[in-house]
């Protein structure tokens, strides 16, 4: 599951850091719009997150997680054929739908739904493994872009997502659905956060996310600008 997360994160959240420059050079589109497309994906993902959470709670996460790679792959395929900014933004909207379906929030909710408190260990291991995403995906994407161009690189990565995500989730999650009710009974019930604490945590997480997103999108370009 950690490796699958690397694939999905690499094909969505961390993608534009490598493809942004080649896209701008090939199309002549403004850097503001090209890099800003990631915001479209993140906004779409955030708006759909509550719905995905409710679906996981009611039906489990197998369907959403299994199809997330295919949805992101569809977005990448549309992006690869984009001849204008409208199509490019549509591609990132679709990628955002896949992000909502397949990134940490949905996966961790699904694991919690299956295993209750026992999911903590699996979540920790998955987070540790997927933390190597940029270490693995950025060099791989750079290689693909250098040898095939950004459009074909997007299509190749889309194919990897289709092959690598759907079968894993179907196999892993299909055999675990029978323990959902047990996990729910074992889960402890806590009090909801107060308004002030909730607002403070929201502000902290939002600030951290803004910094992380900005750095992940522009880090490669910044380093290249310094001659690295």
How would you label these PLM feature ranges?
Residues 70-83:
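C-terminal ends and interior cores of transmembrane alpha-helices
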Residues 23, 101-115:
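Intracellular juxtamembrane helix-capping segments at the cytosolic ends
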Residues 6, 75, 86-102, 127, ...:
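Hydrophobic core of transmembrane alpha-helices in multi-pass small-molecule transporters
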Residues 2-31, 48-52, 138, 215-220:
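Extracytoplasmic
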Residues 47-61:
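Helix-to-loop junctions at the C-terminal end of transmembrane segments
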Residues 111-120, 228:
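Paired intracellular helix-loop junctions of major facilitator superfamily
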Residues 126-174:
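Helix-loop-helix hairpin linking two adjacent transmembrane segments in secondary transporters
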Residues 12-21, 194-228:
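Extracytoplasmic gate region of multi-pass secondary transporters
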């Amino acid at each position: 599951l950690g490796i699958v997360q690397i694939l999905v994160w690499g094909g969505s959240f961390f993608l534009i850091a490598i493809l942004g420059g080649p896209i701008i050079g090939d199309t002549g589109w403004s850097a503001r719009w090209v890099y800003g497309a990631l915001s479209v994906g993140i906004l779409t993902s955030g708006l759909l997150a509550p719905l995905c959470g409710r679906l996981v709670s009611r039906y489990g996460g197998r369907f959403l997680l299994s199809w997330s790679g295919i949805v992101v792959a569809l977005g990448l395929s549309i992006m690869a054929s984009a001849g204008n900014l409208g199509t490019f933004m549509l591609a990132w909207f679709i990628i955002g739908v896949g992000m909502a379906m397949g990134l940490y929030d949905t996966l961790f909710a699904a694991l919690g739904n299956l295993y209750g408190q026992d999911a903590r260990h699996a979540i920790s291991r998955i987070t540790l493994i997927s933390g190597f995403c940029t270490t693995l995906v950025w060099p791989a994407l750079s290689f693909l872009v250098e040898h095939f161009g950004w459009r074909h690189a997007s299509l190749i990565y889309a194919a990897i997502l289709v092959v690598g995500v759907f079968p894993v989730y179907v196999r892993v999650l299909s055999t675990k659905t029978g323990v959902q009710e047990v996990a729910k009974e074992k889960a402890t019930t806590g009090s909801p956060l107060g308004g002030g604490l909730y607002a403070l945590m929201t502000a902290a997480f939002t600030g951290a996310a803004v910094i992380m997103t900005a750095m992940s999108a522009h880090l490669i370009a910044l380093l290249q600008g310094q001659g690295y």
